[in-house]
Amino acid sequence: MRTPIRFPPTPLLLAALCLTASAAAQASDHLICKDATTPEGATQVGALQPLFRDCPRITDIDFTGRADGHKFYSGVYTGPPKDRSFYEQADDGVLMQRGGVLATVKTSSFPGRFPLLSGARPFYIEAQVATSSNHRDNFPAIWLMPIEHNARMEDVYEGDPKSFERWFELDIDEGGFGPGGHHTAISWSGIWPHYKKIQNPNPTSKVPLDRTQPNVFGVSYSPDTLTVRWWLNGRPVLEATQPHVPEIARRQNFYLIVSAQSHKNISHYQMKLLGVRAFVGDATTASGGATVPARRAKGSP
């Protein structure tokens, strides 16, 4: 019988063990990925149809960025995917080292297994995450981007000037900006690199948040009123509407990104994704026009 090799407890390993133990103690019976009820944020906007609900596993991640049929991809279109060394499996989720990314579409900006969130329909989406420390350098992020904003520039619309892009970015939460959550709705437009940015004011909560505990960050969206509302652990915390939520949002289709970023690369930390779930409602007629069709999922080379 081989004698097992014992490794010394490195700071990164200790952080991972503490994060795993904390989550197990606090959230083992409250994982959103095992909760079949409809959250209040979904009910408020009429997003009553479950779209997906998932407890992430390492086997769900594609590390090439291009394989069909995966739930998560380890990168986005702006750069190469992260390799397997950035990720670990925990009992209750996937751990990412600083620099890790999980996105629900391929790096080629084509859909994966999870459906996109159509801006023509009300929706609610939430993610349950925890970090290994509350260091201010940590920049854990949960956000939505339209799949149309890609290298093919599919966010250039008929009637606009050549290469003039328009898209809506919805940041469900970002860490390191203050003691509490940081929630932004951003209307982007223009020709690269001279983009115009319109963002909601006062996005940062002054209420301290312990990010080492499993927190549930959610956002609801209504295409009728072009209003978004952010939710923290089941309670509404902030709201935004036009001009920060632009009309172009109704024509776009959104995917989820969860990323363990850093403000100045000072702190080494891990971010755990424990679960995600999304709900949608019926398509609506935008501003008296025709119902905006949802983008169909399709494969890619």
What are these regions (language model features)?
Residues 2-13:
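Bacterial N-terminal signal peptides that target proteins for export
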Residues 153-216:
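Glycine-aromatic-enriched beta-strand/loop faces of beta-sandwich-type recognition domains
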Residues 28-157, 163-168, 175, 243-244, ...:
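Low-complexity, Ser/Thr/Pro/Gly-rich disordered linker/stalk regions
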Residues 11-21:
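Bacterial N-terminal signal peptides
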Residues 247-267:
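Predominantly extracellular/luminal carbohydrate-interaction, adhesion, and secreted-enzyme modules
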Residues 229, 264-273:
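Extracellular carbohydrate recognition
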Residues 235-253:
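Short, solvent-exposed beta-strand-to-loop segments that form ligand-recognition rims
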Residues 213-229:
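Localized edge beta-strand/strand-to-loop motifs within extracellular or lumenal beta-rich domains
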